[in-house]
Amino acid sequence: AGLAYSVIKNALLKVIKLTDPKDLGKQVVVQGGTFYNDAVLRSFERISGCEAIRPDIAGIMGAFGAALIAKDRYTGQKSTMLSFKEINELRFKTSMTRCQGCINHCLLTVNEFTGDRKFISGNRCEKGLGLEKNKEQIPNLFEYKNERVFRHYKPLKKADAPRGVVGIPRVLNMYENYPFWFTFFTKLGYSVKLSPVSSRKIYELGIESIPSESECYPAKLAHGHVTWLIRQGLEYIFYPCIPYERVEVPDAGNHYNCPIVTSYGENIKNNIEELRDDKIKYQNPFISLESEEILTKRLVDFFRKENGIPAAEIKAAAHEGWLEMQAVREDMTKKGKEVLQYLKETGRHGIVLAGRPYHSDPEINHGIPDLITSYGVAVLTEDSISELSEVDRPTIVMDQWMYHSRLYKAASFVAKNDNLDLIQLNSFGCGLD
């Protein structure tokens, strides 16, 4: 019964995203093989409060629909579909393999037919088909964002870092704030060691310390990233808790981070045994990025006490970090404008692939940006266009999460441009999702 309920709730609340299932009406015709299950059918009726009408052909109504469309669109041309005789004579063999083109390692199904014909499925981009990835150079701002936020920065050599090495995990809020922290620590004389791009192996490194299976996958990955830093022999790891992001939309209700981003550094400290070793200095201070003034004051209080760094140095480093964080936002907006101009000049279409900052992680987005560009469609991020539009306020939701305030602005922009559509990525469907 619980499984049947979860199937319906997931479909109505997470996929269709209904506010109230009872809005469907009093009588609903259902289709699809899933509704052959009486428990699922009854769960639908209980949750929606309607009378569900299940035709005898519910499981094949989609096939009937496709046949009717084909009939309507028939133009009198001979079909390329094989004849019954050719189908009976058809011989093929199927094998499975893993694509080695990128970290997604897609599971490919290779069907080999007579006449040296081959059909491959399961791939998320051209690489699985043996083709050149993004041959037409379709803009993909997920690639640019990863370059600008992470690969753009080159750490100091150890010999040039008088205060040593600090490890920073490539997780959660770091997909938004890493430019600040890299600049801040570099200006203070630290060499910044960033954990690698997420992968299944990184996840498995930290699997023993994950306290709950109900956490979102991006949070679970954090355990592997911190464990990786520990195994590199680092003696200093910094992973702050950020309850408040910077004020990006002044007239929004607030600018919180989600509860996971707010405090996950604390969760890591309490669940990874190696961090109980006095040999590792692990810092996870609660810090607000609300404004440069508030942030700087907190950093001075913390680093002067914990690391013995003079206030003047901390203030100077914080200012440089703040400027760099602003520069990244400006660069993203500039790149967004360039892609919009490209779409205008070429007549192509664009998808705003909107989500949280960590959705630029290929392990978390599962290669969806590459899949979209393989169809000749440009990919933009929500933060590349959010500054180009405003939201009519008050909103019908309580607008108090900073990332979502950005999503609303991006969605408002998309609604006004016919050459754009928006797809929202979410890894858990929590909170305002």
Regions found by a protein language model. Give the residues of each.
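Active-site nucleophile and cofactor-binding loops and adjacent substrate-binding regions
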Residues: 2-5, 29-34, 53-63, 196, ...
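Conserved helix-loop functional segments at active or binding sites
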Residues: 13-21, 50
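Oxyanion-binding/catalytic loops of NTP- or PPi-dependent enzymes
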Residues: 38-43, 52-53, 110
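Extended, hydrophobic alpha-helical segments in both membrane/secreted and soluble proteins
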Residues: 11, 24, 30, 40, ...
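An N-terminal assembly and electron-transfer interface module characteristic of large anaerobic redox
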Residues: 56-57, 74-433
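Glycine-rich phosphate-binding loops at beta-strand->alpha-helix junctions
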Residues: 6, 19-45, 58-59, 173-175, ...
